């Protein structure tokens, strides 16, 4: 038996609470997993930002990346690490850089998904460039924005073609609103998209590897209340349908971690925002759902690092378009896309790995999220976002939301806990890590 260590790097920006929880639960769990004849242990550290030589060896087996979409030095370091050292990374940095929401809309339209009528309009103004005026003078057509609004239909939305976090999104009820939003859009390249209004249901599905969580979503609520906690808000068939859509998008673009917003109207699910490869991961918005995300990150991180999952640098779209050409009905076609996506994420092998090697994770995480360490991790994020006089009340609010999750989680796991005798697990106060020497492969 060979003892190996896999090293996980966290490439972080403003993320505060989930990295703390990730690190501390991993320390409590102290997993030693079997991969073939090898025993694999894990280390985790936060990636520093510094000058680097292109030939310098990177010793991370996995990097969980939260910076690529906006911070170029981290993105270019990750690209080099993948190319030269085979580092597995969430998410594919080339795909994040090149595939914006605009491409995602076009791709899913090409696969036959119901995407609302969407137009791109040239920006209202431009950054000065040497050939700009010549180009516009020769080739740019005048257009009637009001006529575009009529073709799209109202109500509609104007939003950046590459945006996120609801930044720059304007609801348009009429032509006057459309023209006003365009005048204020500045140099941003914008979409005008038909609104799916009124809708019967608004959901957000997060996919992390082959794992998904579907949440009822209220976009009109304050940020810390948008994710609702009700459970039976869609049928089993609808849940599977949305999960298939989410995993299809993720596999198609090579994103391990992404979210999909979809609206139900008159029996049809309309994906409206699904190029979010750095999804919200903070307790201050996810609250009750936050422990699921931390556990999902741990499972997929340990699996991808332990098994040395290979990074796919090139996207393989052909199998999806081959399904499209089979002229299946809409529901059957999305089922087939979902099957391809689950194969992409090696779902069967992942589930076997979790059942065999990470059986204690649920209990260790349950213990941790009831601890003072978890409360303190929450506090650190609350202190970043809320006025000083509101810190105590909101810290307690989010901690109690997680205690509600713990109550539900314990009840859900009760049948398993009575049927199987759990091996001793590390206490919530911490656990000593194995001290046997380990070598890196």
What name fits each language-model region?
Residues 12-135, 377-430:
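Conserved N-proximal alpha/beta basic substrate-recognition cap immediately N-terminal to
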Residues 3-9:
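Extreme N-terminal starter segment of soluble prokaryotic enzymes
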Residues 224-271, 295, 301, 305, ...:
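A long amphipathic alpha-helix within ATP-dependent nucleotide-binding catalytic cores
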Residues 108-109, 116, 136-167, 187-198:
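ATP-grasp fold ATP-binding core
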Residues 162-253:
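Phosphate-binding site of ATP-dependent enzymes
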Residues 306-441:
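Peripheral (often C-terminal) accessory segments that flank ATP-dependent C-N-forming ligase machineries
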Residues 68-69, 274-290:
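Glycine-rich phosphate/pyrophosphate-binding beta-alpha loops
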Residues 60-64, 204-207, 268-281:
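A short beta-strand motif that forms the metal-chelation/ATP-contact edge
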């Amino acid at each position: 038996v060979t003892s190996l260590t896999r090293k996980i790097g966290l490439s972080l920006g403003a993320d505060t609470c989930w990295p703390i929880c990730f690190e501390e639960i991993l320390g409590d769990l102290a997993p030693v997993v079997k991969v073939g004849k090898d025993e694999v242990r894990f280390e985790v550290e936060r990636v520093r930002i510094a000058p680097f030589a292109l030939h310098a060896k990177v010793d991370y087996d996995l990097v969980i990346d939260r910076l690529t979409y906006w911070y170029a030095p981290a993105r270019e370091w990750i690209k080099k690490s993948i190319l030269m050292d085979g580092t597995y990374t969430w998410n594919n940095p080339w795909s994040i850089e090149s595939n914006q929401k605009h491409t995602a809309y076009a791709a899913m339209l090409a696969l036959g998904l119901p995407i609302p009528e969407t137009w791109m309009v040239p920006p209202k103004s431009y950054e000065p460039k040497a050939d700009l005026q010549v180009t516009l003078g020769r080739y740019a057509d005048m257009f009637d924005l009001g006529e575009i609004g009529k073709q799209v239909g109202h109500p509609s939305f104007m939003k950046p073609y590459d945006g996120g976090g609801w930044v720059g999104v304007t609801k348009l009820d009429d032509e006057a609103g459309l023209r006003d939003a365009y005048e204020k859009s500045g140099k941003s390249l914008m979409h005008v998209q038909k609104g799916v209004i009124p809708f019967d249901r608004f959901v957000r599905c997060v996919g992390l590897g082959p794992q998904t969580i579907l949440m009822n979503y209220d976009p009109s609520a304050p940020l810390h209340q948008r994710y609702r906690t009700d459970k039976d808000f869609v049928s089993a068939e609808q849940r599977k349908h949305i999960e298939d859509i989410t995993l299809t998008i993720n596999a198609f673009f090579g994103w391990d971690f992404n979210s999909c917003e979809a609206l139900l109207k008159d029996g049809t699910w309309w994906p409206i925002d699904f190029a979010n490869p750095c999804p919200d991961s903070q307790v201050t918005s996810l609250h009750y759902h936050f422990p699921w995300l931390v556990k999902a990150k741990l499972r997929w991180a340990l699996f991808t690092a332990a098994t040395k999952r290979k990074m796919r640098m090139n996207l393989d779209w052909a199998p999806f378009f081959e399904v499209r050409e089979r002229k299946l009905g809409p529901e059957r076609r999305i089922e087939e896309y979902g099957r391809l996506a689950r194969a992409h994420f090696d779902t069967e092998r992942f589930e076997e790995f979790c059942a065999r090697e990470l059986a204690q994770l649920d209990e260790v995480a349950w213990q941790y999220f009831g601890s003072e360490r978890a409360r303190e991790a929450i506090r650190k994020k609350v202190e970043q976002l809320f006025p000083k006089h509101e810190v105590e009340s909101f810290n307690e609010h989010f901690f109690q939301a997680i205690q509600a999750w713990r109550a539900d989680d314990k009840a859900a796991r009760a049948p398993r806990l009575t049927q199987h005798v759990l091996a001793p697990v590390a206490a919530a106060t911490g656990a000593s890590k194995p001290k046997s020497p380990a070598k890196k492969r």
